[in-house]
Amino acid sequence: MLDEYPDIVIGCAGGGSNLGGLIAPFMQDKLLGKADPRIIAVEPASCPSFTRGKYAYDFCDTGHVTPLARMYTLGNGFMPAANHAGGLRYHCMSPILSKLYHDGYMEAVSAKQTDVFEAATLFAKVETILPAPESSHAIRGAIDEALKCKETGEAKTILFGLTGTGYFDMSAYEAYHNGTMTNHVPTDEELQIGFDTLPVQPE
């Protein structure tokens, strides 16, 4: 394979399983001081647990069966708006990834649905691979970082996770191309409804 080590590692983020698997070897190097790649999570703007959530103890499920875990969460009662990246519609983030983000070892950004599909369409035209909507969040992040490099004249190796194809998501691509796709970004008031469902912790 390529004899390259990434300067930037980018993955899509919903609950964190895919992202965790992608970044694990690079995060190990970072924690051991062997390398210092930037690690970036890209999540949907409609379900922004990293970028707008709270670092708090919460249930991982809506049935309140799981043990409480400290993580970035929108509250177990938060109901994300419907979007075409169903695999990223989850109210909270992996406790391990949450700790890494909280301690400054990784970054997070959010992306609107139409911006994600713009990136997905470009990728499909250039690489002849139709990416899954979830993967397309990472593609959006990779394109944005590449454009920054173009502006600054820097040469950086960017690794992103392409986790699946979008052949079962043709209706989503159709909605993007015919202009009916919408973006939902929750208001602070909508987020507060979810935060109000966080379990109360004793002092």
Each language-model region and where it sits:
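A short, small-residue-rich loop immediately preceding and capping a beta-strand
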Residues: 2-19, 157-162
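Short glycine/serine/threonine-rich phosphate/pyrophosphate-binding segments
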Residues: 12-23, 49-51, 135-143, 167-170
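C-terminal, active-site-flanking charged/polar segments
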Residues: 38, 159-172, 176-177
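Short alpha-helical "patches" and their helix-cap loops
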Residues: 7, 102, 108-111, 153-162
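Short, well-ordered alpha-helical packing segments
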Residues: 10, 19-27, 39, 174
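Active-site/ligand-binding loops adjacent to catalytic centers
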Residues: 1-4, 28-36, 40-129, 133, ...
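Generic, well-ordered alpha-helical scaffold segments in large soluble proteins
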Residues: 12, 22-29, 123-126, 145
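C-terminal structured "cap/appendage" subdomains that terminate the fold
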Residues: 124-163
